[in-house]
Structures are given as C-alpha cells and as structure tokens.
Design a protein with these regions (language model features):
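Edge beta-strands of extracellular beta-sandwich domains
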Residues: 3-14, 82, 112-122, 228-242
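Short, compositionally biased P/S/T/A/G/V-rich stretches that sit at domain boundaries
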Residues: 15-45, 123-147
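Solvent-exposed loop/turn segments flanking beta-strands in beta-repeat/beta-sandwich domains
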Residues: 42-74, 153-183
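Short beta-strand segments within Ig-like beta-sandwich modules, predominantly Fibronectin type-III
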Residues: 78-88, 185-201
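Surface-exposed, short loops/turns at beta-strand junctions within beta-sandwich domains
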Residues: 90-100, 198-217
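Intrinsic low-complexity, repeat-rich intrinsically disordered segments enriched
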Residues: 247-281
Length: 281
C-alpha cells in the first residue's frame, strides 16, 4: 500500500470568538455632586466620579478556549483597565468625567473584545463659573474713590435636589509690594439669565474713602457657585494727579487740600523759576 502526504500553508481564522459580554452598571461616587443631584445615577460634567461595576452575574465569558484577561473602561479621553474575576464583582473609577458615553470592553487572551455601551439616566452639562472681564478705576483717573466692575457667566440651572446659585462673591486687595491679601467686602451680584455682573464703588485701605492715592494696589474678585469659583486679578495705579485744578486753587503732584487753602499748592517736588531753584524754607 502506498501512503501520500500533502502539506498546506495558510492562516486559520477563528470566527465568532469575541467574548460574551452584555452589561455593567455605574454610580457616581462624588459626595458633593450626589448631594446636588439627589442620587448616584445623575452625572455632572467635569465633577462626577464614575464607578463602573461588573457583577458576577454580568461577567464576560470567553469563547473557543480563550480566557478573559481584563476589562477596559473608556469615558471620553480617559480610560482604565480593570482586573477580571470569575467569582467576584470588579469595579474601577474614572474621576471628573466629561462625557455621557461609558464604554466597557471585555478583552480575552487573544486580544478579541466585546464592548458594552451605556449612558447615565441624566447627564448635566455643567460649565464652570467665569469672570470674563473686570476693571478697577479711580474716579476721574485720580483720587481715592474707586469703582469696581465685572461681568461673566455661570450655569444657572437645577441639579435635581437643588438649583445652582452664587454662593459667595467678594473682593480682596493688597499693595503691589505686599504678599498678604486683605478681604475688602462682599459684593451683591446682579443676575440676568446665565449672566452675572457688578458695578459699584468699593472700600479700601482708607475705609469708605477708598484707596490711598500715594499707593498702587492689586485687587481681585472671587465669585463662587455650588461647584466652582473664578478669580480675576487687576492692578490699580496710584491716584496722584500731575495737576489738580479746583475752584479754590491749583495743586501740583498731589490733590488740592482745601484745609490748607492758597492759590497754588506744590507737593513732593522742587520749584524752579527761570532755571533757578526756589527755596521756600
């Protein structure tokens, strides 16, 4: 009897070998957002921490003699690998999620995968409060009276258990040479839809009279809602005028002091007439 042998070279493709995987659950674990929404199923963009859970009942099952190696949770641009277990629930958490699409991949030892996609019951497209523009000005460009103005936006909607709100707004100041901030006072913000604004005179280092004209200051506004805050810092220059003209007289290099009187007051400088220094002492 004769025997015949034939050799074939090729690639064997195993089909229908992706793991069986059909479900997982999630919950928010951020205590702050849970309090705002009233539960752990609503997700707040940028603040909720999403914990994804694969229970034993929902575990992935490999096919054709492969084994499950891991799960991979993907939310937006963030991802996390989670160890597989056949006899215990497994979970992983992605913090501060910015997408309402949660993808969980079950990956086997051959690299085959099956994805399950879910979305939260409620996804709140929250945006941080922000001061877009602000200014501080001395009245007339000189003097101690200072006006502060700013405008911005906030997320003016409800979370579920409570509505968003401006929780505080105040300003602080310091001289430009100092490192220590001083709280100036609270500010009453005007609301118009999602827009916020303020304009008014503010107290300073000389109380209700404002800010010392001989000094320059840093002034910053801090506004907060239930989740975020915005800080805007400005510089206030000194308020000493080169020339101050009043009904009672003229002052050079300073404000005219009515208590002193006189037609001409000169501060912090020498006086020259025809190139000659005048000595008043």
């Amino acid at each position: 009897n004769s025997e015949y042998y034939s050799e074939k070279v090729g690639t064997l493709n195993v089909v229908n070998s992706n793991p069986t995987f059909s479900n997982f659950t999630y919950e928010d674990t951020n205590a702050t957002t849970i309090k705002l929404t009233g539960g752990n199923q609503a997700i707040v963009k940028g603040y909720s921490n999403v914990k994804a859970i694969v229970s034993v009942a929902n575990k992935a099952i490999a096919k054709n003699y492969a084994s499950i190696s891991k799960y991979r949770l993907v939310i937006g641009s963030k991802q996390l690998d989670i160890n597989y277990s056949s006899d215990a629930s497994v979970s992983g958490t992605i913090n501060k999620v910015e997408s309402n699409i949660f993808n969980m991949y079950a990956i086997d030892s051959r690299g085959n995968s099956t994805v399950k996609q879910i979305s939260p019951n409620r996804y709140l497209d929250y945006s941080d409060i922000i001061i877009k523009q602000a200014s501080v000005q001395r009245t007339g460009g000189v003097g101690s009276e200072v006006t502060l103005a700013f405008s911005g936006t906030y997320w003016g909607y409800g979370f579920g258990a409570m509505n968003n709100a401006i929780t505080s707004c105040y300003y602080e100041y310091k001289t430009t040479t100092s490192d220590s901030w001083i709280k100036g006072g609270d500010l009453s913000v005007s609301l118009d839809g999602n827009n916020i604004s303020f304009k008014g005179t503010i107290k300073g280092d000389i109380g209700a009279n404002g800010f010392d004209i001989q000094k320059s200051f840093n002034i910053r506004v801090i506004v907060k809602d239930r989740l975020s805050q915005s800080i805007y810092t400005m510089t206030l220059g000194s308020g000493t005028p080169a020339i101050a003209i009043t009904k009672k007289g003229i002052s050079v290099n300073g404000m005219y002091k009515e208590s002193l009187g006189g037609a001409l007051q000169i501060w912090n400088g020498d006086v020259y007439i025809d190139g000659k220094k005048i000595n008043f002492s």
